[in-house]
Amino acid sequence: MNIKDIKKINFFISEKKNKNIHLIGIGGAGMMGIALILLKLGYKVSGSDLLESLMIKKLINLGATIYLQHSEKNIKNVDFIIKSSAISSNNKEILAAKKRNIPILLRAEMIEILMSFKKGIAVSGTHGKTTTTSMIADIFIDSGLDPTVINGGLIKSINSYAKLGSSSYFITEADESDASFLYLNPNIIIVTNIEPDHIDHYDNSFKKLKQTFLIFLKKITLYGTAIVCIDNNAICDILTNLKCKIITYGFNKNADVRIFLYKQNNFIGHFYIILKNNKKLNIILNIPGKHNALNAAAAIALAIHEGINNDLMIASLKNFQGTCRRFEFLGFLSIDQGFDKRANCMLIDDYGHHPTELSETIKTIRISWPNKNLIMIFQPHRYTRTYNLYHDFVQTLSQVDVLLILHVYSANEKFIVGADSLSLFNDIKKLGKNYVTLISNHNMILDTLIQTLQGNDIILIQGAGNIDTIAHKILIKKTKKVIK
């Protein structure tokens, strides 16, 4: 879709609020935020997905009509459609829409339309987008700037994926997985890092992925700003020839916003930010990990650039509640091991599904709880990712004490030989560094888990598929423990 088409659709939306907007894949993390904003703006919203969730119930309560199946009947009275990137071209509703000449927009195209009259701030990168966007949202809200926000995860402070604000600020997570972020034209772009992921969409070329990020950055005008992590080599490779202002952040001594003296105690991260004028800021975070210090540094760089009061910014970060499924502490479990013996375990839930994300989570746990028995329940996500990063997965997954590995969550991808959980299990077991077992039936999780408990355990639920709902239901049901 070109700019002229977007302008036509923009006029169509603004002038015809009685028209019906239908979102295919409305339950996806990236789609729910758009649906919330459209409902708040007063549009008629319908949508379809395959599974019910708390957020889908919330959308229904706000007035959306949602179908828990895909059918051409769902778009009977639809004027145009927004599709998730997870929806295939042969989806029944997509095919029916094409026959009826109903306009179809990608998620990113819709965000660009919503953002077009605002000061757009886009948060991109392989890792850390959702947490960084959440931090920025909190800082702007706490500073009274009332932004509009669309995030890829639940922001705990507002208990939502999105917020409609009254100010000129529009903050959004920008998705690089299918290069759709190139539809966006923000004033400010943050790039947290660039690593090989989703490279099947880039002809299996990391170079092409980096070049796409460069194209995205070059969309910033002369009066815009790029805020980038100087610790990441791939980012440094593409910073040449940008006409806009560049602000760097990181642990690197040359960073404009530099992290200094990072320390960690349990769930608390503490560090200083050193600015170019040698001013020092004392930062306390309620979430641990150097990667989260980097996320905070990106938010700090933006806040300073926008003239937000330092004290308000520091207080906001100190009160930051985190993001759903990003190193989320769910509580303690007391699990009956039999023979009047119980194991008290910490339960942590994390969305990370890339080897780098897994590695950072493991490091964070080892720093704060070095003597704990670390048990990871892991569900690989996508055959393509498992195939492309196979060696890294094997090495990283061998770093936990106990690994319970579920079958790959395919996300509708076709099976790839050698990129399955059985192959991972066999190769990790060969290393002999940890106890690893393959979970072929979800009902085996608790029984297998009980055999590995030592009484000083951390249970880490890890993955981006449906592992969170599977593990939560089993653990809560079997232990009869309400997780906070």
UniProtKB/Swiss-Prot annotation:
Q: What is its EC number?
A: 6.3.2.8
What is the protein named? UDP-N-acetylmuramate--L-alanine ligase
Catalytically driven reaction(s): UDP-N-acetyl-alpha-D-muramate + L-alanine + ATP = UDP-N-acetyl-alpha-D-muramoyl-L-alanine + ADP + phosphate + H(+)
Could you tell me which pathway this protein works in?
Answer: Cell wall biogenesis; peptidoglycan biosynthesis
The family note in this entry says:
Belongs to the MurCDEF family.
KW Cell wall biogenesis/degradation (keyword) present: yes
* Annotated localization: Cytoplasm
One Pfam family this sequence matches: Mur_ligase_C
Q: Which Gene3D superfamilies match?
A: Mur ligase, C-terminal domain (3.90.190.20), Mur-like, catalytic domain (3.40.1190.10), NAD(P)-binding Rossmann-like Domain (3.40.50.720)
In UniProt terms, what function does this protein have?
Cell wall formation.
Residues holding ATP = G125, T126, H127, G128, K129, T130, T131
Taxonomic lineage is:
Bacteria, Pseudomonadati, Pseudomonadota, Gammaproteobacteria, Enterobacterales
Q: Which InterPro entries match?
A: Mur-like_cat_sf, Mur_ligase_C, Mur_ligase_C_dom_sf, Mur_ligase_cen, Mur_ligase_N, MurCDEF_pg_biosynth, UDP-N-AcMur_Ala_ligase_MurC
GO molecular function, a single term: ATP binding
Q: Which domain of life is it from?
A: Bacteria
Source organism: Buchnera aphidicola subsp. Acyrthosiphon pisum (strain APS)
Q: Name the gene behind this protein.
A: murC
What keywords would UniProt list here? ATP-binding, Cell cycle, Cell division, Cell shape, Cell wall biogenesis/degradation, Cytoplasm, Ligase, Nucleotide-binding, Peptidoglycan synthesis
Q: What GO cellular component entries does it have?
A: cytoplasm
Q: Name one GO biological process term.
A: regulation of cell shape
HAMAP family cross-referenced by the UniProt entry: MurC
